[in-house]
């Protein structure tokens, strides 16, 4: 059985292939997650609709329709190439969708665009030495001290914490 996406998607695949070929020389190996080169690359991917496709423009996304086939084509063509992939992580994959669905307008404006661009890197830290993933037994506490939060406790397995 041979499955085809259709002419519209063939055109889109050709566009993605062209972009990939034009950008084969981009190399971010050894660059910090916070480097301006990474932020610029991330923005270029957004501008072309190869990242944050369905996130509204007003929040820093491409503003396109959700289209699983286009998303699949992007993933396939990027996987065949050595060009840098878009940033991912907790902020982009977990926080941004939550803010878009449940956040206040102020939170969306403050955090979504800089997170998508890679200007803000997030981590999650809920595992503790005596708790594992049992969230009911967590001991870390945060207390408001004037205008700042003071957090006391210990976390383990904090992905991307050194960049957050």
Labelled PLM ranges:
Residues 1-89, 106-117, 121:
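Amphipathic, small/basic residue-rich leader segments at the start of a protein or domain
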Residues 86-106, 132:
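N-terminal glycine-rich flavin-associated loop
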Residues 39-43, 64-65, 96-99, 133-136:
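Short, solvent-exposed polar/charged micro-motifs at secondary-structure junctions
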Residues 62-64, 106-164:
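Glycine-rich, Trp-frequent "lid" loop and neighboring beta-strands that shape
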Residues 46-47, 94-95, 143-144:
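Short hydrophobic "helix-edge" motifs at membrane interfaces and signal-peptide entry regions
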